């Protein structure tokens, strides 16, 4: 007697959570920011004070993307206002770029952290958390359509340009992409702050400024 075929499990796979479920129908930066306040696309919202959405000029030609908000950003609700943000401001100014003319944001909109004593210490988001949050960043890019997209650090670069992208070997290079007319990757300013000596910090800061001067050159048509 022939065996009866074993019935396949037809139970549908559970839907993967993501920010896509929270995107507004009509998308502007204002409507995206408002919708993101209630995002529960991953569990990071549980430990964060608030959503930290992008900020800056709505007609900005340059969009800078980091990894995630830090402790100060989480408390204040604004991106790049902590020590790394202050260093970024200095680098932008030295490169001939005005932060007020840019738009700054992060791949992940909630602060991921672990407690050490009384402090909340940054913890890198994992691949699933990045995937879940990316719809916000893609929507920001779609609305703003920047001329130059600057990826600050490996998390931003690999989230947008692919997991094989290496900032160490491709930083400062001008790339073409569907994301923006030009894409330039460089280090995240927080990596400079982690350098052990003042000489190392100064050297890495000058390298960041050099990368940002490439961006300034693109805006002026010099590159």
Question: What are these language model-derived features?
Answer:
Residues 2-223:
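A polyanion-binding, active-site-adjacent surface
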């Amino acid at each position: 007697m022939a065996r009866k075929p074993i019935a396949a499990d037809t139970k549908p796979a559970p839907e993967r959570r993501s920010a896509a479920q929270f995107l507004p129908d009509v998308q502007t930066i204002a409507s995206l920011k408002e919708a993101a306040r209630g995002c529960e696309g991953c569990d990071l919202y549980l430990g964060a004070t608030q959503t930290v959405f992008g900020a800056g000029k709505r007609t900005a030609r340059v969009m800078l993307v980091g990894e995630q908000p830090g402790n100060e950003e989480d408390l204040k609700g604004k991106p790049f206002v902590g020590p790394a943000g202050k260093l970024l401001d200095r680098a932008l100014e030295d490169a001939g770029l005005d932060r007020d003319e840019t738009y700054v944001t992060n791949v992940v909109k909630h602060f991921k952290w672990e407690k050490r004593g009384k402090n909340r210490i940054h913890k890198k988001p994992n691949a699933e958390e990045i995937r879940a949050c990316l719809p916000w960043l893609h929507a920001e890019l779609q609305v703003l359509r920047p001329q130059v997209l600057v990826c600050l650090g490996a998390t931003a670069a690999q989230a947008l340009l692919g997991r094989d992208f290496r900032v160490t070997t491709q930083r400062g290079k001008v790339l073409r992409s569907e994301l923006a007319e030009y894409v330039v990757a460089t280090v995240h300013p927080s990596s400079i702050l982690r350098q052990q000596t003042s000489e190392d910090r100064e050297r890495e800061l000058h390298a960041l400024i050099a990368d940002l001067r490439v961006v300034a050159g693109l805006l002026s048509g010099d590159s």
